[in-house]
């Protein structure tokens, strides 16, 4: 495991972009599985500026969890957000976007194997320690592949999510974990220092041989380099 502690959110975002561009600039096909949400917002702003006007047709994008499309959207919730946050701003060719969906999740792992695995999975840390849609108490540490989960949501009733499981995620060549803010400090300490526990699903990720954590000082306040 490699821990990179940055001064603030801006620097965390800049460092994450450097990791992504380091992979994207390879003279070969590059497979990036990326996260939606609030944490990567600045990452995508910076990255979109850097890729505009340059040829990154070798880079292909994927998501690691998804739910049903809302309204008349072409994509599910995750991919719709990624489109808004990054794909549209970076003018990514739709042919380079390969969504995990509620329809293809059962064949997703075979598909990922066929493309040569993901070069990077970039993900954030849930406040309850979840990764992808693997929440505490979902038996997520039992070598599970991509699967369908149902959750009772306070405002939306029961929702279903397709999500990559532990085995699927651990097959990636590199896991890039982005964490910011003091509100994530306690759970990040639990992930990195505590035992591997299903009540803190992300704790299993530290077993990956190429696991990089980029955290700002606020999130890393209980850690030492």
Q: Can you name each region flagged by the protein language model?
A:
Residues 1-32:
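N-terminal glycine-/serine-/threonine-rich phosphate-binding loop
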Residues 28-50:
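Glycine-rich N-terminal segment of FAD-binding domains in flavoprotein oxidoreductases
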Residues 33-37, 63, 122-125, 177-180, ...:
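Short beta-strand segments
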Residues 38-39, 125-130, 182-183, 219:
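Short glycine-rich anion-binding loops that position phosphate/pyrophosphate groups of nucleotides
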Residues 46-56, 84, 136-145, 196:
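A glycine- and small-aliphatic-rich helix-loop capping segment at beta-alpha/alpha-beta transitions
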Residues 55-122:
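Ligand-binding beta-strand-loop-alpha-helix segment within the catalytic cores
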Residues 121-167:
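Class I SAM-dependent methyltransferase SAM-binding "motif I" and its flanking Rossmann-like core
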Residues 173-225:
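ATP/nucleoside-binding phosphotransfer catalytic cores, i.e., glycine-rich phosphate-binding loops
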């Amino acid at each position: 495991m490699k821990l990179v502690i940055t001064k603030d959110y801006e620097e965390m975002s800049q460092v994450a972009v450097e990791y992504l561009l380091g992979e994207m600039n390879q003279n070969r096909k590059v497979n990036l599985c990326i996260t939606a949400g609030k944490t990567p917002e600045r990452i995508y702003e910076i990255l979109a500026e850097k890729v505009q006007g340059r040829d990154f047709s070798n880079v292909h994008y994927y998501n690691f969890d998804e739910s049903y499309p809302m309204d008349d959207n072409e994509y599910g919730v995750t991919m719709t957000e990624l489109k808004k946050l990054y794909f549209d701003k970076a003018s990514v060719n739709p042919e380079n976007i390969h969504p995990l969906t509620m329809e293809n999740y059962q064949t997703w792992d075979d598909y990922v194997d066929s493309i040569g695995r993901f070069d990077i999975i970039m993900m954030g840390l849930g406040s309850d320690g979840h990764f992808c849609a693997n929440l505490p108490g979902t038996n997520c540490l039992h070598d599970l592949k991509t699967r369908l989960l149902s959750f009772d949501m306070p405002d939306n009733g029961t929702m279903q999510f397709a999500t990559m499981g532990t085995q699927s995620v651990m097959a990636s060549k590199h896991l890039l974990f982005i964490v910011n803010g003091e509100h994530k400090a306690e759970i990040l300490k639990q992930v990195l220092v505590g035992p591997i526990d299903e009540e803190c699903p992300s704790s299993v990720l530290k077993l990956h041989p190429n696991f990089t954590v980029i955290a700002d000082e606020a999130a890393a306040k209980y850690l030492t380099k």
